[in-house]
């Protein structure tokens, strides 16, 4: 595990984000590969003299971020996982990444059919 000061890490993070990309994708990378969640990072940021413990070094994390930016590859493919509802799913480039809108559709269907007494079965066909 790599130990780095919060101050040094925040400087590195700002430099990475200045290359492009969006904050949620970068946070996803840090959580999945770096081993630090955005909420933990926010707490650590309150005290720049503290240290952050990462699963991977900054050079590796930066190279994954560069791949994301240069190849326009979804961060979920590079991390090898994605989240859908309460599931953590393994993904590769051979599968489609679940869309956030699908979670919303499931919530709407559950709300409509929640009061039905009969047991209902649904299938999402993942037609892309």
List the predicted regions and their residue ranges.
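SAM-dependent Rossmann-like transferase core, predominantly class I methyltransferases
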Residues: 63-128
């Amino acid at each position: 595990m790599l130990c780095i000061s919060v101050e040094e890490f925040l400087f590195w993070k700002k430099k990475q984000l200045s290359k492009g990309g969006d904050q949620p994708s970068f946070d996803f990378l840090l959580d999945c590969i770096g081993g630090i969640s955005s909420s933990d990072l926010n707490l650590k940021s309150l005290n720049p003299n503290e240290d952050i413990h990462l699963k991977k070094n900054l050079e590796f994390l930066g190279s994954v971020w560069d791949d994301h930016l240069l190849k326009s590859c979804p961060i979920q493919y590079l991390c090898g996982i994605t989240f859908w509802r309460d599931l953590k799913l393994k993904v590769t480039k051979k599968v489609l990444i679940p869309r956030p809108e699908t979670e919303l559709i499931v919530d709407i269907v559950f709300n409509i059919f929640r009061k039905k007494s009969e047991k209902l079965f649904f299938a999402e066909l993942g037609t892309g």
